[in-house]
Amino acid sequence: MTTIHRRPAPWRGNAVFCASAAFAAGLETLFARLLERRPADSAEALLRQRLHHELEHGSGVLLHDSALLRGLAEDEFQRVFRAFCQWLGRTVAINRNGEYLKEVRDLGLRDARDAPQRGHLTSQELAFHSDRADLTVLACWSPARRGGAFRIRSSADVLATLEAANPAWLPLLGQPIPHDLRDEGDADYALVPLLTETPRTFVLRYIRKFNESVTRHGLSLAPQVRSMLDGLDEAIERADGYAELDFSKGMLVLVNNHTTLHARTEFSDDERQRRCLLRCWLSSEFTRELPESFLPLVHQVAAGSLRGGIRPLAQEPRP
């Protein structure tokens, strides 16, 4: 029987990180085992189940500042992070090259509406959005010299804010609108609703620049849709709503892309310090069913199915 995933309890601010303390000792023990390549411990199954429950039915967020990761050399850091991601879920491709683990760093690129680039390869501000996978996992190898704060917003609180301030927009959130596939799908664009809420499932998927860039394909957004997106942005970006953290080496963050949104402030590097995060997208067997309109985005919509990520140009062996 499929588990019901109703709208979770809303939250605001950095208090959301308090629940993560309950996982700290177990995660450090797990990282030590992965580093030493020892066989799995029987207690790890319960830890994994608890983590997924927090991500699916709780806050949708986990923050862990790992002393073990902080002390590792680069090759061991990457190996332990990769092993952790494979332990937690099923990795899905993060780009058309079929890579499953990618460094988030500034390569000097600039993302623009008519000349799209992957945001994680720029130093630009990234507005609140959700990724193309059930879960996003990030680990900091090196923080930026300046900027690069990471922000997380409760989707349930965003909707509660809209319900109180602009209830007229709520029906529009459930209507499909054009979503640019950014040259990473089988078509130019898809028609996808921002909000799906039924007695069995809850999903808020939002990445406004993908709605705006459909102009590349000769489309335009109706004035009413633009007004609705403006109202949604206002609810998302309220200063007392989001949690915020400054990355430091060894810091690990997990977010559920169906129940939270995340953002990044602009950053700058110098020769001595360059921002570098490791990023992995995961499919979770514990997650919810999605609407059929999500098929162009995630390829499968059944609860717990292997889904999400970007379909590679050529299939490569999974790591």
Model-derived features: positions:
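Internal, non-catalytic "lid/hinge" segments that mediate substrate recognition, gating
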Residues: A93-R96
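Active-site environment of non-heme Fe oxygenases that use a 2-His-1-carboxylate facial triad
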Residues: M1-A45, Q49, H57-L62, R70-G71, ...
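Short glycine-centered, acidic/aromatic-flanked micro-motifs in structured strand/loop junctions
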Residues: S66
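A short alpha->loop->secondary-structure connector
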Residues: F81-T91
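"Short basic amphipathic alpha-helical interaction patches in structured regions
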Residues: D75-R82, I152-S154
